[in-house]
Regions:
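S-adenosyl-L-methionine
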Residues: 1-54
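Conserved class I S-adenosyl-L-methionine
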Residues: 56-63
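Conserved SAM-binding loop of SAM-dependent methyltransferases across substrates and taxa
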Residues: 68-77
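Short beta-strand element of Class I
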Residues: 79-83
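Conserved SAM/SAH-binding beta-strand->alpha-helix loop
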Residues: 86
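Conserved SAM-binding loop
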Residues: 93-94
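Conserved SAM-binding strand-loop segment of SAM-dependent methyltransferases
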Residues: 101-112
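C-terminal substrate-binding/active-site "lid" region of AdoMet-derived donor-dependent transferases
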Residues: 131-177
Length: 177
């Protein structure tokens, strides 16, 4: 954990969102495979502290969007990976990673359904559609660690909830197979 680096991550993403708004764009859009809306940095940072992410080595974000959760996770883990199909969001992840000099984050411009999640200590999702549309099957087949689900919506039906907690009114749930 590094509060100074976290502050820099927040500043970098704040600038990105302000630039979008100046151009008349909202910081959310369709990616062609789903829908992107950014995570709230302070909530994710607090959740990562609560689950003691620093005691784990690997993290993967399925549908990592602009990479914010991955760069925050990289402050805790040895290796943080993000998979994002939208090229503009993928490029923004790489840009902020370089600017912030966070070397233990890795980003792939790909469909996360084609990326194995086996072997990761934590899998992060902020789902944009019901789990029964393919995500839950992937998790049931490949999840070897824990799932950190962000939000009150689209929870898996066949995984076991280990922990649930609120951060600023938003729900985080830890699941296992």
């Amino acid at each position: 954990m590094n509060d100074k680096a976290f502050t820099e991550i927040k500043k970098g993403y704040g600038s990105f969102y302000k630039d979008l708004l100046r151009k008349g764009k909202l910081p959310l859009w369709s990616t062609g495979k789903g829908f992107w809306g950014g995570v709230i940095a302070d909530e994710v940072y607090e959740a990562f502290k609560k689950i003691k992410l620093h005691k784990h080595k690997t993290f993967i974000d399925l549908g990592s969007g602009d990479g914010k959760a991955v760069l925050i996770a990289a402050l805790f883990c040895k290796r943080a990976v993000g998979i994002e199909i939208d090229n503009e969001l993928f490029q923004k992840s790489l840009e902020l990673q370089r600017k912030l000099n966070i070397s233990n984050a890795i980003f792939y411009n790909n469909d996360f359904h084609e990326q194995s999640i086996a072997g990761f200590d934590f899998v992060f999702v902020y789902p944009d559609s019901p789990m029964h549309r393919g995500m839950e099957k992937k998790l049931l087949n490949e999840l070897t660690g824990k799932l950190l689900h962000y939000g009150h919506h689209f929870h898996p039906q066949n995984l076991k909830a280990q922990d649930k907690f609120l951060v600023n009114g938003n729900l985080f749930t830890v699941y296992t197979r």
